[in-house]
Structures are given as C-alpha cells and as structure tokens.
Amino acid sequence: MVVKIGILKCGNIGMSPVVDLCLDERADRNDIDVRVLGSGAKMNPDQVEEVAKKMVEEVKPDFIVYIGPNPAAPGPKKAREILSAGGIPAVIIGDAPGIKDKDAMAEEGLGYVLIKCDPMIGARRQFLDPVEMAMFNADVIRVLAGTGALRVVQNAIDDMVFAVEEGKEIPLPKIVITEQKAVEAMDFANPYAKAKAMAAFVMAEKVADIDVKGCFMTKEMEKYIPIVASAHETIRYAAKLVDEARELEKATDAVSRKPHAGAGQILNKCKLMEKPE
C-alpha cells in the first residue's frame, strides 16, 4: 500500500524545508507518495485559502500536514478552518506562538506539533537580506536536527503513515516539543552531549524572544538592528553547541541513527560500521 501525504507549506519556519525530506531521506521509500503545495514566504489568508482548498479538493491525500509560522495568525487560521471542514485528517506544525491556540486546534479536530526551539527570524530590512536569511535557517535546521526536535516531528508523521498502512484510525498528534521531549528522541549516550543539546534548545527558544523585541517592540533603528543581530549570533552559537554534542557522541562511536527501510520501517543503529536493524 502507498500512503499519499499532502504537505502545505505557507510561510516558513526552520522545519519547513525538511519536513517532507525527513520522511524519505534517501528517496527510496516505496510506501509513501508526497505532494507539496505552498504559498512561498507569505501566508496571507487569500493565498493560504487557495492552496489549502486545492489540497483538500484536488490532491485528496490520506492525511495533510500544514506547516508554517504562528498557527494563531489570520492566514493559518484560514487553513485550519478549511482543513477542519475538509474531512481529511490533518496536523498543524508550527512554532511557539501556536501554543496559545493548541486547545482550539484540538477542538477543531486537528492535530498539532508545536516546536519551541524553532524561532522567529530577525526580519528587519536594515539587517535581513537573502544571505542572512539562509544562514539563519541553516543554523535553525542544525538545532532542530541535533537536539532531537526534528526526530519528534518525523516520528509523529510516521505514526500517521503506519496507521493508514495498518487500516487503523489515524492518530492526530498533540505535541509541544520541549527540550526534554527533544533530547529523549535522540537517545544520547553521553550525558554531556545531552546537556549541550538541551542548552542549544533553550538558546534557540530565547532567540525568538529577542527577535520579537527587535521586530515589534523597538522602534528606533539604532536600537533594533543590534537586537536582531544579537539573536542571529545566539542561534549561531546554539548550532555550534549541537555540533559539539554530536562530536562527543562520535568520539565513543555512539551516534544514534534511525534510517527508514525501503518499506518504511524505522531502523536503528549506533555503531558507525554496523548495519541498521
């Protein structure tokens, strides 16, 4: 059986570029077929409505994953409205601002995965250009991967896939990813590696607070430019911490790897030269 997954990308968070790729990291999985629709960097209600309706009415997947910033904003709320009424199981993946709407999403019959370490970018024209944007997102992706947050998201979607394959009711995740949930998913062998990953997670959370201050709460240019710049420096060092954590695991040949089999099962290995089972 091939499970058809629909992914809606409206706006961008750090998890957005890899949410589909983490389900099929070698492009050889034969049990899923993924379709991605998106509205680019913007997530205004009209744009979101267009792609959400197309997903529900034309693509008609087995389930839908919506991903983007702030699920409580007007555009994402429009998507939630369409998905809630669409008759297709759906999950919302978002960042920390969505936590205040998690109960509302559950009442709408939607699942959610809210990632506390996926921070807002420093979106000030005097600071943010395409290069800075790409480097920030690269650092965030490194934090998501190295702390275990990415693995939590991947596991939640895989559980939905496995339910479809087994003919069971699709479980709609209701997850807020904290530093504890993230590092548990990574199976760290070295407690210092785990501690470094936890520190990186908390630093990434703080980046969001700094960028909110720089983007929305500070009006003077000479003040908000160094504020958002400091947020980007913070995520850069958080990414360095997850590198350090992984190097500690490498030193004892204990890196947790969980690749997908061709048929979709999640395999497991820790030693570099052993086969996954």
Curated annotation (Swiss-Prot):
Q: Which GO terms describe its biological process?
A: methanogenesis, from carbon dioxide; one-carbon metabolic process
One of the record's GO molecular function terms: ferredoxin hydrogenase activity
Position of the signal peptide: none
Catalytic activity field: 5,10-methylenetetrahydromethanopterin + oxidized coenzyme F420-(gamma-L-Glu)(n) + 2 H(+) = 5,10-methenyl-5,6,7,8-tetrahydromethanopterin + reduced coenzyme F420-(gamma-L-Glu)(n)
Q: Which family does it belong to?
A: Belongs to the MTD family.
What is the annotated role of this protein in its UniProt record? Answer: Catalyzes the reversible reduction of methenyl-H(4)MPT(+) to methylene-H(4)MPT.
Pathway given for this chain reads: One-carbon metabolism; methanogenesis from CO(2); 5,10-methylene-5,6,7,8-tetrahydromethanopterin from 5,10-methenyl-5,6,7,8-tetrahydromethanopterin (coenzyme F420 route): step 1/1
For whether the record's keyword set contains Glycoprotein, the answer is no
The encoding gene: mtd
EC main class here is oxidoreductase
Keywords per UniProt: Methanogenesis, One-carbon metabolism, Oxidoreductase
Q: What is its EC number?
A: 1.5.98.1
InterPro entries attached to this UniProt entry:
MTD, MTD_sf
Q: Which domain of life is it from?
A: Archaea
Q: Which Gene3D superfamilies match?
A: 6.10.140.120, F420-dependent methylenetetrahydromethanopterin dehydrogenase (MTD)
| Descriptive protein name | F420-dependent methylenetetrahydromethanopterin dehydrogenase
